[in-house]
């Protein structure tokens, strides 16, 4: 699959960002529910990527029309790509309601990623990243994409 220079730069930036956070451990394990607008401040661009009949993954809005998720989320358990018509991104999900819902038009896993079920080795995990293109952009003041570097550091 060919990817353009912009998407390549986004993938490279995302890999660098992920590499900087690999190994970091949470200071506490208590999860805080996001019930109010104030609770969810700063988290609005995080959403749930629903995969009809197959579960869900977490994803983050990184451009008005692009989300970032794990590459293993876009593959079936046999390693074949999941049909993008089965995906739905629900941005700003709070108490079961999303602020924006979009279908997916294209999924691009990292070019070096090779599907391996339950992979835990660092080289495989480092490439477990994918950029998905939304069918329509999300242009809402409250749902601002996370800022990522325009190119690798």
Q: Can you annotate each of these PLM segments?
A:
Residues 2-63, 108:
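Protease-domain processing segments flanking chymotrypsin-fold serine proteases, especially trypsin-like
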Residues 28-41, 75, 81-139:
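Conserved catalytic-core segment of clan PA serine endopeptidases
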Residues 47, 55-56, 70-78, 143-146:
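N-terminal post-signal-peptidase region of extra-cytosolic proteins
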Residues 62, 104-105, 144-149:
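"Short basic amphipathic alpha-helical interaction patches in structured regions
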Residues 65, 69:
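Cytochrome P450 catalytic-core helices
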Residues 120, 140-153:
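Flexible, gly/ser-rich surface segments that form the specificity/activation loops bordering the active-site cleft
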């Amino acid at each position: 699959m060919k990817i353009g220079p912009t998407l390549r730069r986004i993938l490279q930036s995302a890999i660098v960002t992920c590499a900087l956070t690999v190994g970091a451990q949470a200071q506490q394990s208590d999860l805080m529910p996001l019930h109010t607008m104030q609770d969810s401040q700063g988290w609005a661009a995080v959403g749930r990527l629903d995969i009809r009949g197959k579960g869900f993954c977490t994803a983050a809005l990184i451009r008005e029309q692009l989300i970032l998720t794990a590459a293993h989320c876009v593959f079936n358990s046999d390693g074949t790509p999941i049909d993008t018509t089965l995906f739905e991104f629900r941005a700003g999900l709070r108490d079961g309601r999303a602020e924006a819902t979009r279908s997916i038009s294209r999924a691009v896993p990292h070019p070096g990623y090779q599907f391996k079920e339950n992979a835990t080795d660092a080289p495989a995990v480092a490439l477990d990243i994918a950029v998905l293109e939304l069918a329509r952009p999300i242009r809402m003041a409250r749902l601002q994409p996370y800022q990522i570097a325009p190119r690798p550091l």
